[in-house]
């Protein structure tokens, strides 16, 4: 009987150690991937920074509506035609390509710029948004600890931080554009109690636009003193927020000029 109990204890200990080792490996693998993908994005950003600024892609390049790609995004666009823009915020770690895959809407939730599987994913635009025409571009990014990806948006919960970082740079392939932050708020997704901000892409009329902005201001964590009017172009940045189940942290900004 004692031998039987000893065997059970040994088996249990082996199983426990095996589980601990597996979990440890998974954690190590995750953070190793975070570091690897972070470095890869830094290399992509360096390509953009070092790119020439006075050339454009030839007229026969496959660009929407025949427009020319900005010189600094040429090489990246030719590597992956799912790229639709670039987002950055001065003084923050957010400095990434932005993708869109209309036929596979959430593809970049779990894929990197090279279309390889990645837990970090790549910031991407909601599939029903038209980069050139929509009133509101909804852009998603993972909330990764350490201020990586859209995890850096967590800092916008503080008004004092907002005061030092009031604008967002979001370039399309053909236009460099600055956006002014209108509101920062928290809500929950997939719930009747939450605000379905992701449903607003194109305003049906002025009332529809004002209703969206009004709800954003109502939920805002603080008053930015900035609002938006019918005809303004918006971007809405969305990432996970962990104070509630299916929580979301949302930053809404309007195009300047």
Question: How would you describe each model-predicted region?
Answer:
Residues 20-257:
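Solvent-exposed, non-transmembrane regions of membrane-associated and secreted proteins
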Residues 1-16:
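N-terminal Sec-pathway targeting helices
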């Amino acid at each position: 009987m004692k031998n039987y109990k000893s065997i059970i204890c040994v088996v249990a200990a082996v199983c426990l150690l095996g589980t601990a080792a597996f979990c440890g490996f998974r954690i190590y693998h995750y953070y190793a991937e975070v570091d690897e993908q972070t470095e890869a994005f830094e290399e992509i950003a360096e390509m953009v920074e070092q790119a020439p600024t006075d050339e454009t892609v030839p007229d026969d390049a496959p660009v929407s509506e025949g427009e020319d790609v900005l010189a600094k995004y040429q090489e990246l666009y030719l590597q992956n035609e799912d790229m639709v823009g670039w987002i950055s915020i001065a003084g923050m770690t957010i400095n990434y390509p932005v993708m869109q895959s209309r036929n596979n809407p959430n593809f970049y939730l779990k894929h990197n710029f090279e279309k390889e599987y990645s837990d970090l994913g790549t910031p991407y635009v909601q599939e029903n948004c038209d980069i050139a025409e929509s009133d509101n571009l909804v852009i998603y990014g993972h909330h990764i600890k350490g201020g990586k990806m859209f995890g850096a948006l967590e800092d916008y919960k503080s008004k004092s931080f907002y005061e030092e970082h009031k604008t967002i740079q979001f370039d399309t392939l053909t236009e460099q554009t600055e956006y002014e932050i209108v509101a920062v708020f928290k809500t929950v997704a997939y719930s009747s109690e939450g605000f379905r901000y992701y449903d607003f892409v194109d305003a049906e009329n002025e009332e529809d636009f004002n209703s969206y902005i009004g709800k954003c201001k109502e939920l805002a964590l603080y008053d930015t003193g900035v609002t938006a009017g019918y005809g303004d172009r918006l971007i809405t940045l969305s990432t996970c927020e962990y104070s509630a189940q299916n929580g979301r942290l949302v930053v809404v900004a309007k195009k300047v000029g």
